[in-house]
C-alpha cells in the first residue's frame, strides 16, 4: 500500500466566492459547458473564475482514455454536441475575455479523433470574438499529423500538448499516449512556424531531477518555447498517489535552469497548471 504523504502548507488553495466567480459559474452552467477546471479539480479554479477566466473542455465530459493522474470521467462518450462550438464562443464573449483557452477529452471513438470538432470550435470562437487570442491544448490524435495539421491551419495563437511526465514514468501515468508520440506532435507544431509550441509537466510522481532536465532538453530539441511545471495533486483515491511534494524553492530552481537552457517562457511553481496565466504565453 502506498504511503500517504502529508500535503504541505504552501499548497493551501484559495477558494472562490466573489461576484465574478459566481458570474463565471453561471455562464458555464447556463451554456451546459464543461471545463477542465471542474472535471480536473484544478487548484486554481477559485482564482481563475474570480478573474473571469476558465479553460473550456470540448468533446463532452467523458474521455476514451484512463490516464492515472486525471480525474476526468472515462468510458464510452456521447455523440458530439454540434452546438458546443457556438456555445463555447458565446460564453467567451459573455465573459468578456481577451484570451481564451480550450482543451478536450480524447475522442478515440471517432474516425478523426475529434479534429473536425476542434476546427469548428476555433472557427466559431474567431467568428464571434474578434480580437480574442486563443490557446488550444490538444490531444495527440494518436500521432496522426494530418489531423494536427487541421488544428494548425485553423490558426490558434498557441498550440499546447502536454508531455505530462518524464519518459520513464509515461507508461504508468498516461493511457495510450507515448512520450515519443507527444514529442513528435510538438515537433510538428513547432516546425509549422505558425505559432508557439507549448508543453507542460507534473512533478511529484517519483521523477528525478536528471529526468526533468532530460524532458526539458527533449522539448527544446522539438522546438517547444513555452513550458509549465507544477505539482501533481491526487484528485481522487482512484488516481496515482503523490510520491513527493516539491518545494517552492525547487520549482524556482527549475525555472531558472529552464530559462538558462533557452525556453522563452517558463512557469514553474507548485500550483502552476498548463493554462494558468496562459495570456502570458503568446
UniProtKB/Swiss-Prot annotation:
Where does the record place it? Cytoplasm
Radical SAM core domain segment(s): 49-264
**Does the keyword field hold S-adenosyl-L-methionine?**
yes
Q: Which reaction does it catalyse?
A: [[Fe-S] cluster scaffold protein carrying a second [4Fe-4S](2+) cluster] + N(6)-octanoyl-L-lysyl-[protein] + 2 oxidized [2Fe-2S]-[ferredoxin] + 2 S-adenosyl-L-methionine + 4 H(+) = [[Fe-S] cluster scaffold protein] + N(6)-[(R)-dihydrolipoyl]-L-lysyl-[protein] + 4 Fe(3+) + 2 hydrogen sulfide + 2 5'-deoxyadenosine + 2 L-methionine + 2 reduced [2Fe-2S]-[ferredoxin]
The record's EC number reads: 2.8.1.8
Q: Which GO terms describe its cellular component?
A: cytoplasm
**Record's cofactor remark:** Binds 2 [4Fe-4S] clusters per subunit. One cluster is coordinated with 3 cysteines and an exchangeable S-adenosyl-L-methionine.
| Swiss-Prot/TrEMBL cofactor(s) | [4Fe-4S] cluster
Q: Which domain of life is it from?
A: Bacteria
Q: List keywords of the entry alphabetically.
A: 4Fe-4S, Cytoplasm, Iron, Iron-sulfur, Metal-binding, S-adenosyl-L-methionine, Transferase
Give the residues the record marks as binding [4Fe-4S] cluster 1. 37, 42, 48, 275
Which InterPro entries does the entry mention?
A: Aldolase_TIM, Elp3/MiaA/NifB-like_rSAM, Lipoyl_synth, rSAM
Q: Provide the residue positions that the database annotates as binding [4Fe-4S] cluster 2.
A: 63, 67, 70
Q: Name one GO molecular function term.
A: lipoate synthase activity
Q: Name one Pfam family in it.
A: Radical_SAM
Which pathway does the database say it acts in? Protein modification; protein lipoylation via endogenous pathway; protein N(6)-(lipoyl)lysine from octanoyl-[acyl-carrier-protein]: step 2/2
Q: What is its main location?
A: cytoplasm
**CDD domains in the cross-refs:** Radical_SAM
Q: Could you say which protein family the record assigns here?
A: Belongs to the radical SAM superfamily. Lipoyl synthase family.
Concerning NCBIfam families, the annotation shows: lipA, PRK05481.1, PRK12928.1
The name on file for this protein is Lipoyl synthase
Gene name in the database record: lipA
Amino acid at each position: 500500500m502506498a504511503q500517504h504523504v502529508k500535503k504541505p502548507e504552501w499548497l493551501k488553495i484559495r477558494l472562490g466566492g466573489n461576484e465574478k466567480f459566481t458570474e463565471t459559474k453561471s455562464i458555464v452552467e447556463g451554456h451546459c459547458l464543461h471545463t477542465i477546471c471542474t472535471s480536473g479539480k484544478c487548484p486554481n479554479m477559485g482564482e481563475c473564475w474570480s478573474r473571469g477566466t476558465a479553460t473550456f473542455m470540448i468533446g463532452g465530459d467523458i474521455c476514451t482514455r484512463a490516464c492515472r493522474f486525471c480525474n476526468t470521467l472515462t468510458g464510452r462518450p456521447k455523440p458530439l454536441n454540434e452546438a458546443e462550438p457556438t456555445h463555447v464562443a458565446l460564453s467567451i464573449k459573455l465573459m468578456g475575455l481577451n484570451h481564451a483557452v480550450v482543451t478536450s477529452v480524447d475522442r478515440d471513438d471517432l474516425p478523426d479523433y475529434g479534429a473536425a470538432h476542434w476546427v469548428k470550435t476555433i472557427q466559431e470562437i474567431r467568428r464571434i470574438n474578434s480580437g480574442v487570442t486563443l490557446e488550444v491544448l490538444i490531444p495527440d490524435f494518436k500521432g496522426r499529423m494530418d489531423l494536427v495539421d487541421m488544428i494548425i491551419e485553423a490558426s490558434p495563437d498557441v498550440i499546447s500538448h502536454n508531455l505530462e511526465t518524464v519518459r520513464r514514468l509515461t507508461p504508468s501515468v498516461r493511457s495510450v499516449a507515448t512520450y515519443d508520440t507527444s514529442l513528435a506532435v510538438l515537433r510538428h507544431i513547432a516546425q509549422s512556424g505558425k505559432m508557439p509550441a507549448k508543453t507542460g509537466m507534473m512533478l511529484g510522481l517519483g521523477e528525478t531531477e536528471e529526468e526533468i532536465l532530460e524532458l526539458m532538453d527533449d522539448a527544446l530539441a522539438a522546438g517547444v518555447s513555452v513550458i509549465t511545471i507544477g505539482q501533481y495533486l491526487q484528485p481522487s483515491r482512484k488516481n496515482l498517489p503523490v510520491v513527493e511534494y516539491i518545494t517552492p524553492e525547487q520549482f524556482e530552481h527549475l525555472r531558472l535552469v529552464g530559462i538558462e537552457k533557452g525556453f522563452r517562457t517558463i512557469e514553474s511553481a507548485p500550483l502552476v497548471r498548463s493554462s494558468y496565466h496562459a495570456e502570458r504565453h503568446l
